[in-house]
């Protein structure tokens, strides 16, 4: 078994402090565009679905609108199905799978279920291909009241 740290920052087995988090963040670079690859796809769904901005994340100079896509019509008597993608930004298939589902299969559920799809919970993570947000917080471990992860708090 190896004791080698996943990141060459800090000490294995010790939680990161502010200095280690800043050191990690300084190594992060944008590798793809949330706007070009995700938001444009969501915009293309507006004719068939209700698209709403349920929040906004601001990290440094970057602002990320958060979108939810709902089936139309929304019928109170039907069960509701929630589909999320991109809680961890490096899980690209979840983001594109949610978008593909909306384009190709969502209409199969018309009259049977209300669909609420959040294709990309963590847009900064998506752009940087990271599990964490820029505060080194894992949004997937943070779906709770008073969440330290803004991505998770926006859905709470």
Show the residue positions of the predicted features.
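Residues at the C-termini of beta-strands that transition into short coil/loop
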Residues: 55, 72, 121
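Short beta-strand-to-loop junctions in surface cap/lid or active-site-entrance loops
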Residues: 66-77
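Short active-site segment of divalent metal-dependent hydrolases/proteases
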Residues: 89
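Short glycine-rich or small-residue beta-strand-to-loop segments that form or flank ligand, phosphate
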Residues: 81-86
């Amino acid at each position: 078994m190896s004791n080698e740290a996943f990141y060459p920052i800090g000490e294995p087995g010790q939680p990161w402090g502010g200095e280690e988090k800043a050191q990690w963040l300084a190594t992060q670079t944008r590798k793809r565009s949330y706007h070009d690859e995700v938001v444009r796809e969501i915009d293309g769904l507006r004719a068939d679905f209700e698209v709403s901005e349920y929040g906004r994340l601001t990290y440094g100079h970057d602002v990320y609108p958060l979108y939810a896509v709902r089936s139309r019509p929304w019928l109170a008597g039907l069960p509701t199905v929630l589909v999320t993608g991109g809680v961890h930004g490096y899980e690209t298939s979840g983001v594109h799978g949610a978008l593909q589902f909306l384009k190709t299969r969502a209409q199969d559920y018309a009259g049977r279920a209300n669909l609420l799809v959040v294709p990309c919970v963590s847009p900064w993570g998506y752009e940087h291909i990271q599990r964490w947000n820029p505060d080194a917080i894992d949004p997937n471990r943070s779906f709770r009241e008073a969440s330290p992860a803004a991505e998770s708090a926006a859905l709470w």
